[in-house]
Amino acid sequence: MKKNLIIVESPAKAKTIGNFLGKDYEVIASKGHIRDLPKSSFGIKIEDDEFIPEYRITSDHSALVKELKSKAKDAKEVYLATDEDREGEAIAYHIAKAIGKDENTLPRIVFHEITKSAIENALKNPRKLNMHSVNAQQTRRLLDRIVGYKLSPLLGQKIQRGLSAGRVQSAALKIIVDREKEIRAFVPLEYFSIDMIFQKDLDAELVEFDKAKIEKLTITNKDRAKLILEACKNEVYSISDIESKERKIAPPPPFMTSTLQQSASNRLGFNPKKTMMIAQKLYEGVNTHEGVMGVITYMRTDSLNLAKEAVENARKFIQANFGKDYLPSKANVYTTKTKGAQEAHEAIRPTNLSFTPEIAAKFLDKDELKLYTLIYNRFLACQMSPAISQTQNVFVKNDRVVFKISGRKILFDGYYKVYGDMDKDKILPNFKIGQNLKVQNLEMNSHFTEPPSRYSEAGLVKKLESLGIGRPSTYAPTISILTSRDYVTIDKKQLIPSDVAFNVTEVLEKNFSDIVDSKFTSNLENTLDEIAEDKADWQETLKEFYYPFMRKIEEGKTKIASQKTVTKLGESCPDCGGELAIRKGRFGEFVACLNFPKCKYSRNLKSESKNESENTAAKAKANGTGITCPSCQKGEIVERFSKRGKFYGCSAYPKCNFISKYKPSEEKCEECGETLVIKELKKGTFLECLKCKIKKEMKD
């Protein structure tokens, strides 16, 4: 008896769906894209202004395609069940092509969640493949190939090898570089504050002096600050006014991709890549108290829509578990402000409210539980009543100055019951107008304005979203590309551009301004949305981009000056005798042998005076530790740097491959004879054997 064949992307998804269906169905995974543009060539044929992608079955999918063809041939019906977004639609298209079926006749089934009811409903309501969505994805893929294949080699030729450029990544990189320029150009401004504490421990803010309003940056002159301080020393203060306001704090909307990534970063410390990997697992299926199922809806979405049934279930759950006060009279409805949002999709929510975080703790690992709990509570919160807070401002004055004491308390916690930043209440005493207050402490303090902060990964995602750059599926990969290409390093959650990031951005700004222009990139994203909606032609879009872009590429070959000039040091390489020179790398300048790649000798370039030229021995000594290499007993242990930070290696590299994260000492372990390394801890500096783990205090 013939079976129905369902083809999905991932094995995990296939396994979960297979558990829901009977013996009449077989579910198999394509394991992602089975066709793509070739890696070894441009892969786009241009004939009579038509752009024809030359797709190939990827080498790691050859055997799988044979299996799919065989199973499809014998199947009663073949269902394409890839994700419901452009990428999923394109994967379905390529599957149909690869197995030799007409993409217009195969039934396409879609669902927002992987639950039994959702799959059964999808099978009852198949549709045709949406070729407009496929063409939007093809346009994006071809645009990325054009930019990457034509522009990246030019950057490699003019700046350094291994560089890349892309529509979204280059625009994102410019945002990071521009922020770094702001920070470097920032000039701090000194300002002063008059800080008052009234009895008992009541912090007060100066808001008025001689009838003039005082704000944060009002007092920038020290003499004036002293004058105001003197006026504040009058110890007779009385309450002149009391303001009290109630405020409703509306619950936040449910998560979409960008806000999930931001909240997971801020609350859980997860980077976007980690968030999406965990969310994918939760979507595709995990063990639950009711068997294997997807426990959240599709995680790549820019929609805030919620299924009517899901909202009704949430309202029942809220009333049953929290009471009627926590349930608004009508369901809360949210609409997205994101450019190009696909409203047919759903927001990210739990698929089964009975799978509570308490029950989930028995089935999910630590990080899965954290993210699931965040999604679960946010969904419940979005359908709960607002929180109500009361703010109180008490104004205290003498003859010349007015201070403000602020207080706050939560009158009703509302959605804060499950989700929210519950700041500690600052409840003020019962004051009366005319009441006198005594000064507990009064002082003048100096401050300096601070430069704008660098973007965090979550902050960059928020910025990209606000500018309409990229879509839910591209945020995490964009950051991964920037870090893997060494354009950006992440230090204490801050994105820091490298020297080469400045060089590349400068070249692109001068010669390919469209590529780094956020408005152009956003408009192109909007055009892709229009293609998906059949409001724009994909071939025309490619044509309008390609020809002006290629003219700039040709101009750039002669117009862009090479930055690969080297400064010879007049020194001989200690390894091969060749000439040493200063080269530019991803992390700045360094010394290298001109016989590269035959000779791999290199070292750090220490900051030197422009009028000072040091000889080779002096420079080598600057990196040296004076400790003999414990491995070869010939070389010297030297301090080196990589993109992961400082490490210690042998000066005889590459002949000696000794490497250590910690600085080796001259002492040996009494137990095994291994070299002890120096570890600096909060408790002090110790010597430790990495083999025996024996520690001993380091003597001065």
Swiss-Prot record:
Annotated Gene3D superfamilies: 3.40.50.140, Bacterial Topoisomerase I, domain 1 (3.30.65.10), Topoisomerase I, domain 2 (1.10.460.10), Topoisomerase I, domain 3 (2.70.20.10), Topoisomerase I, domain 4 (1.10.290.10)
Entry annotation: catalytic residues: 298
Keyword Transmembrane: no
Region (Interaction with DNA): 164-169
Listed cofactors: Mg(2+)
Pfam families: Topoisom_bac, Toprim, Zn_ribbon_Top1
GO BP terms in the entry: DNA topological change
Reaction(s) catalysed by this chain's protein: ATP-independent breakage of single-stranded DNA, followed by passage and rejoining
Entry's EC annotation: 5.6.2.1
GO molecular function, one term: DNA binding
Keyword line: DNA-binding, Isomerase, Magnesium, Metal-binding, Repeat, Topoisomerase, Zinc, Zinc-finger
Broad class of enzyme this protein falls into: isomerase
Residues that coordinate or bind Mg(2+): 9, 83
Marked site positions, Interaction with DNA: 33, 140-141, 144, 149, 300, 485
Positions annotated as zinc finger (C4-type): 573-599, 629-656, 669-692
Subunit structure: Monomer.
Protein family (similarity comment): Belongs to the type IA topoisomerase family.
Cited function: Releases the supercoiling and torsional tension of DNA, which is introduced during the DNA replication and transcription, by transiently cleaving and rejoining one strand of the DNA duplex. Introduces a single-strand break via transesterification at a target site in duplex DNA. The scissile phosphodiester is attacked by the catalytic tyrosine of the enzyme, resulting in the formation of a DNA-(5'-phosphotyrosyl)-enzyme intermediate and the expulsion of a 3'-OH DNA strand. The free DNA strand then undergoes passage around the unbroken strand, thus removing DNA supercoils.
Protein's name according to its UniProt entry: DNA topoisomerase 1
Species this protein is from: Campylobacter jejuni subsp. jejuni serotype O:2 (strain ATCC 700819 / NCTC 11168)
This protein's encoding gene: topA
